[in-house]
Amino acid sequence: MTTTIDGNEVGDGIREDVSDSVETLREEGVTPGLATVLMSDDGASKTYVSMKQQACDELGIESYHHEIDPEAPAEVLFDRIDELNADPDVHGILVQMPVPDHVGERAVLNRIEPEKDVDGFHPENVGRLVAGNARYKPCTPHGVQKLLEAYDIETEGKDAVVVGRSDIVGKPMANLLIQRGPGGNATTTVCHSRTQGLDEKTRNADIVVAAAGVPEMIDAEMLSEGAVVIDVGINRVDANTEKGYQLVGDVDFESAKEKASAITPVPGGVGPLTIAMLMYNTVKAASLQSGVDVDLP
């Protein structure tokens, strides 16, 4: 019997923990604050920012939103980030990607103070993650860990394959899986577009994390019997629907569920955890910066 992992249920539990911690902080006169910065006309980016603002409102986190003309010089964005770095009411800063080419993603990430980098992508925070002393774990990989934990899926001693090597998911996911402690101690292989014999590697895995951004690339033929399959992908494909498309993951769900012992659907699997973990990191940032302890599991 295959278990379909319910990301909404797990995400709701994390939000409850975050809400309790927000209350603890507020009782001590600290209101967690998250600043979102948008320098794009992209509709999907606007939607993502709106979802993050809504989550803040629901959990009692102060949301500060800033929009910058995509044609503006890079210095306009950098000056705004500097202002937010200096603002004691702002505990977390998130610049929604992508940013225009003339700005550059790396320059933006370097500009945010590490203590306020609640995405966990500043070089200092990446280094701390690799060293096993993470300040803020990147939201999506941390969310995957929470899903595995919630469903009592053991990682210790298991063979894990991460398909995808992005800075956002693939690399940090692999780093979390190899760390000592709960949710880690796995023997981890990272595969990517240049990997030879991908199907052989995934068939030898106890846990497969698909994060390549290729629709339905993983099917049952690429899996071992009883594998745990975590689908991080979210892709729009043409479909005969009212919107003209449907969302699918990097895994062929209908095929893979016939072999998997546990699998995440798309949507409703990993997605709800990404924003929940952003709220988690924001509250952790407020706790670290204010010195008020909170009980975040």
Task: Please tell me what each predicted stretch does.
Residues 23-34, 40-58:
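N-terminal glycine-rich anion-binding loops that anchor highly charged ligand groups
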Residues 45, 49-89:
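Active-site cofactor/substrate anionic-group-binding motifs, chiefly glycine-
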Residues 38, 94-98, 231:
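Short beta-strand segments
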Residues 39-41, 46-50, 135-232, 243-255:
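Glycine-rich phosphate/diphosphate-binding loop of Rossmann-like nucleotide-binding domains
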